[in-house]
């Protein structure tokens, strides 16, 4: 597997005192793989928090079957993008099936869930679902619960610095409202970058963390070529967009190579600018 590149980002927030900082590692789109060197990098970076923004696992629906995720794409994507996504889905399903003749998807997913437990030993870890976590098996749910990570699907939890929330394929507006009105730093995990303008921009959040776009698969002149849910030349395929950080992912799931698009471990530091209390 290709080497992982660490990308670094900084943002200021008035919800932390000056001189204080919150360091977050964004892990996204493992798709049942265990990337070589990921745990070592996380230990070296010493994050205060690890955010796993979806598609840790890999689950495919049978060809032709649709769920809420596909209906969301159908409702918001241009027709040409929908056709291309449908084609890629069929190709991926074929090659994934061939790859898993020797190891079932369940076995691979359980292996990467062990990685989730190792991440939780490094720093408090929060996991929100992507489109591949639509249907978790009972064994997978038990492994997530035992990992020490917090699973957040349309839910949020208080922390010593503020709050962390996570949404699924159908964001809960009331949950988002409650999170954005909380005290302290407000961090949201949302797998789908295209949801930012659609559902999240109206909420006051310090940081939104996403994946899903895989960097646009092929990057030309600093822009991705294609992303599911956004189509050709996506607006948000990888990098920092204001207070929205999109990870480029940590694996390749298609037969199309990642060109000019290395595996990505983003590290974002939120730096406090509020006057310190005397």
Residue map of PLM features:
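Core catalytic region of metal-dependent phosphoesterases/phosphodiesterases
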Residues: 36-159
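Beta-strand-turn-beta hairpins that frame and shape the catalytic cleft
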Residues: 4, 12-25, 149, 156-166, ...
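Conserved beta-sheet core of the metallophosphoesterase superfamily
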Residues: 126, 193-274
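Alpha-helical membrane-targeting segments
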Residues: 1, 67-103, 218-243, 255-260
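Binuclear metal-dependent hydrolase catalytic cores centered on His/Asp/Glu-rich metal-binding motifs
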Residues: 137-138, 142-149, 155-199, 203, ...
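Acidic, histidine-bearing metal-coordination/catalytic regions of metal-dependent phosphoesterases
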Residues: 1-37, 45, 63-64, 73, ...
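Solvent-exposed loop/turn segments at secondary-structure junctions
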Residues: 31-32, 56-59, 131-135, 169-172, ...
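Active-site neighborhood of phospho(di)ester-bond hydrolases with catalytic His/Asp-centered motifs
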Residues: 25-29, 49-55, 103, 124-131, ...
């Amino acid at each position: 597997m290709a080497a992982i590149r660490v990308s670094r980002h900084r943002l200021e927030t008035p919800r932390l005192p000056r001189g204080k900082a919150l360091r977050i590692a964004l892990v996204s789109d493992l798709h049942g793989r265990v990337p070589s060197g990921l745990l070592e990098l996380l230990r070296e970076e010493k994050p205060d928090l690890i955010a796993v923004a979806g598609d840790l696992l890999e689950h495919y629906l049978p060809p032709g079957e649709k769920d809420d995720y596909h209906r969301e794409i159908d409702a918001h994507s241009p027709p040409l993008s929908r056709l291309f996504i449908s084609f890629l889905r069929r190709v991926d399903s074929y090659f994934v099936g061939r790859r898993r003749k020797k190891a079932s998807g369940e076995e691979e997913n359980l292996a990467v869930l062990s990685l989730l437990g190792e991440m939780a030993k490094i720093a408090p870890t929060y996991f929100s679902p992507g489109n591949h976590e639509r249907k978790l098996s009972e064994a997978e749910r038990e492994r997530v619960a035992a990992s020490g990570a917090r699973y957040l699907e349309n839910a949020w939890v208080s922390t010593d610095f503020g709050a962390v929330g996570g949404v699924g394929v159908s964001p809960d507006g009331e949950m988002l409202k409650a999170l954005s009105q909380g005290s302290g730093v407000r961090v949201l995990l949302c797998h789908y970058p295209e949801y930012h303008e659609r559902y999240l921009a109206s909420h006051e959040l310090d940081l939104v963390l996403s994946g899903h776009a895989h960097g646009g698969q092929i990057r030309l002149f600093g822009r991705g070529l294609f992303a599911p849910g956004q189509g050709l030349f996506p607006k948000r395929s990888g990098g920092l967009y204001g207070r929205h950080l999109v990870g480029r992912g940590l694996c390749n799931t298609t037969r199309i190579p990642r060109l000019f698009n290395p595996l990505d471990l983003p590290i974002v530091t939120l730096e406090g600018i509020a006057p310190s209390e005397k």
